[in-house]
């Protein structure tokens, strides 16, 4: 199963978030992994590049602001992402397909109320 298949499978049951929201979280996960673990080494077997919920949310924050700037808040709203809990819901939706892994310590509460979207994605550009 590839990422697009996983998103289709999830969205058959849960349409709260647009496909773009899922892509954004996937790209943010890549960004967070690079922040925490550095660039992946070419030719090396995949090693555990796990990040925690708060680490992923920091990667999400940086990626969104760098990519979308002043449009960040409105795009997130349009795609169904209104709070950090929504990022966690997307992560756990993809985990449920088996495409993303998780550690025993990972839980949805790691994503709850970590920061305010309006404060984070709108205020810096106001």
Task: Describe the function of each predicted region.
Residues 1-126:
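Non-transmembrane, aqueous-exposed alpha-helical and coiled segments at domain scale
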């Amino acid at each position: 199963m590839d990422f697009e298949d996983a998103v289709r499978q999830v969205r058959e049951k849960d349409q709260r978030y647009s496909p773009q929201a899922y892509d954004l979280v996937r790209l943010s996960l890549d960004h967070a992994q690079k922040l925490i673990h550095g660039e992946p080494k070419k030719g090396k077997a995949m090693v555990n590049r796990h990040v925690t919920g708060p680490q992923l949310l920091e990667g999400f924050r940086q990626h969104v602001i760098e990519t979308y700037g002043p449009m960040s808040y409105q795009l997130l709203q349009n795609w169904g992402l209104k709070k950090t809990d929504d990022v966690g819901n997307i992560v756990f939706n993809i985990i449920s397909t088996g495409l993303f892994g998780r550690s025993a310590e990972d839980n949805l509460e790691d994503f709850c109320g970590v920061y305010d979207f309006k404060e984070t994605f709108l205020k810096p550009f106001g």
